[in-house]
From Swiss-Prot:
Enzyme class: transferase
GO BP of this protein: acetyl-CoA metabolic process; adipose tissue development; cellular response to amino acid stimulus; cellular response to fatty acid; cellular response to glucocorticoid stimulus; cellular response to insulin stimulus; cellular response to lipopolysaccharide; cholesterol biosynthetic process
Gene: Hmgcs2
Effect of residue 83 to E: Abolishes enzymatic activity
Residue sites binding (3S)-3-hydroxy-3-methylglutaryl-CoA per the record: 80-81, 166, 204, 208, 258, 301, 310, 380, 414
Domain of life: Eukaryota
Taxonomy of the source species: Eukaryota, Metazoa, Chordata, Craniata, Vertebrata
Designated name of the protein: Hydroxymethylglutaryl-CoA synthase, mitochondrial
Modified residues (N6-succinyllysine): 52, 83, 118, 221, 256, 310, 327, 333, 342, 350, 354, 358, 447, 473
Organism: Mus musculus (Mouse)
Keyword Nucleus: no
UniProt-listed PROSITE patterns: HMG_COA_SYNTHASE
Assembly behavior: Homodimer.
Length: 508
């Protein structure tokens, strides 16, 4: 029977026992844990070694209950057929009414995760939120989520909001892992929550919106392990996408610059990651170069799906340029003409793009395409986009197919901050294993997406107008019928004259 660590007060008792007795870690663990059905045991107290296999134990995805079809938007906006569905690679776009805001999205996804896993609320020692959807310049989303912990009496929870465009979720994940592998870890689990509402003014950018949230339970002995020492990061100052107008939800976007920044960050993060993993291999006696062949699956931050296909092709181009002439001729047919180019010379080269997309198509279909299911059908979720891709990947493969694989991940946030990192999937795919349970938990993703209501472009536009009208308005209750929300969804019930927000939950 699976077990779970005890409340915080029990942690203190065990630490005292450590000082008074010579109990081994195994004795401490069995004395301090309680039975639990879906999450594997975690070591309780810090020892002289790292907690083993820190990573993602459980994952929950939330998206709004309505969407607009991109083919309908193409007709409504009088653009050529395929501009959104082919040019951007988008099929549907989820969106929120005035009844939902970033607080309600995060309340919903955390509550769902905790209820599904049956995790006691006092078993969480860190909760961090990654978001760029700011409705208060001072009060963090994390503070609103503390309402969920009130009945448990658990207020000893570290972490706060982290913001830098779409990168905040990844920064929160890294912070959770760092906490767990530090002297400050008290033996409890961490929750990482990332969510956003991506909206744009009417025009070319509006079809690249979306909305959603992802919650991840972080702990040791995870089925998706963050590979230690393997992060390649790039940061710089850029004005590719930013939100200086605090009176509006809408960003300012330099589209061409943003694509160049994304690709440049990808190049540099991949180079840094490759250097670190090759150093690890060299220390182990392996002098082989790292390439995409060493990654079984690859997921990306997804502003729109076509960008991801270009990004995988870009990684192949990095491998091509760093390989020997013999390998270039044998493994990368069709790219020989670009052998003498430098990476920075190719960001806007359409001939290079076309050749790379063709050369990498099979690899894209094998490693990445399945990860785009949620993005294709719901749009850009900003901080939760990358982790929605992870959920999509898990939902389209069996535990047996995933077991033992490496999942590469690229996270990007405008402004800019980016990282390339990786997960190592557990080799245990047996029935009832943590990996099998994790995969099963997201297997209903396609069914849930299909259960949403299809709204017309006219209805979508009206709701966008309402969001503009009520943004930062006070003393009002949002219009709309809460029966249209998914069961168990938290929603904004009222904003009073002092901007204080009250939330309620739909019946489960």
């Amino acid at each position: 029977m699976q077990r779970l660590l005890a409340p915080a007060r029990r942690v203190l008792q065990v630490k005292r026992a450590m000082q008074e007795t010579s109990l081994t870690p195994a004795h401490l663990l069995s004395a301090a844990q309680q039975r639990f059905s879906t999450i594997p045991p975690a070591p309780l107290a810090k020892t002289d070694t790292w907690p083993k296999d820190v990573g993602i134990l459980a994952l929950e995805v939330y998206f709004p209950a309505q969407y607009v079809d991109q083919t309908d938007l193409e007709k409504f906006n009088n653009v050529e057929a395929g501009k959104y569905t082919v040019g951007l690679g988008q099929t549907r776009m989820g969106f929120c009414s005035v009844q939902e805001d970033i607080n309600s999205l995060c309340l919903t996804v955390v509550q769902r995760l905790m209820e599904r896993t049956k995790l006691p609320w006092d078993a969480v020692g860190r909760l961090e939120v990654g978001t760029e959807t700011i409705i208060d310049k001072s009060k963090a989303v994390k503070t609103v989520l503390m309402e969920l912990f009130q009945d448990s009496g658990n207020t000893d929870i570290e972490g706060i909001d982290t913001t830098n465009a779409c990168y905040g979720g990844t920064a929160s994940l890294f912070n959770a892992a760092n906490w767990m592998e530090s002297s400050y870890w008290d033996g409890r689990y961490a929750l990482v929550v990332c969510g956003d509402i991506a909206v744009y003014p009417s025009g070319n950018a509006r079809p690249t919106g979306g909305a959603g949230a992802v919650a991840m339970l972080i702990g040791p002995k995870a089925p998706l392990v963050l590979e230690q020492g393997l992060r390649g990061t790039h940061m710089e100052n850029a004005y590719d996408f930013y939100k200086p107008n605090l009176a509006s939800e809408y960003p300012l976007v330099d589209g061409k610059l943003s694509i160049q920044c994304y690709l440049r960050a990808l190049d540099r993060c991949y180079a840094a990651y490759r250097k670190k993993i090759q150093n690890q291999w060299k220390q182990a006696g392996n002098n082989q170069p790292f390439t995409l062949d060493d990654v079984q699956y690859m997921i990306f931050h997804t502003p729109f799906c076509k960008m991801v296909q270009k990004s995988l092709a870009r990684l192949m181009f990095n491998d091509f340029l760093s390989s020997s002439s013999d390998k270039q001729n044998n493994l990368y047919k069709g790219l020989e003409a670009f052998r003498g180019l430098k990476l920075e010379e190719t960001y806007t080269n359409k001939d290079v793009d076309k050749a790379l997309l063709k050369a990498s198509l099979d690899m894209f279909n094998q490693k990445t395409k399945a990860s785009l299911y949620l993005s294709t059908n719901n749009g850009n979720m900003y901080t939760s986009s990358l982790y929605g891709c992870l959920a999509s990947l898990l939902s389209h493969h069996s535990a047996q197919e995933l077991a033992g694989s490496r999942i590469g991940a690229f996270s990007y946030g405008s402004g800019l901050a980016a990282s390339f990192f990786s997960f190592r999937v557990s080799k245990d795919a047996s029935p009832g294993s943590p990996l099998e349970k994790l995969v099963s938990s997201v297997s209903d993703l396609p069914k849930r997406l299909d259960s949403r209501r299809r709204m017309s472009p006219e209805e979508f536009t009206e709701i966008m107008n309402q969001r503009e009208q009520f943004y930062h308005k006070v003393n009002f209750s949002p219009p709309g019928d809460t029966s249209n929300l998914f069961p168990g969804t938290w929603y904004l019930e009222r904003v009073d004259e002092m901007h204080r927000r009250k939330y309620a939950r739909c019946p489960v």
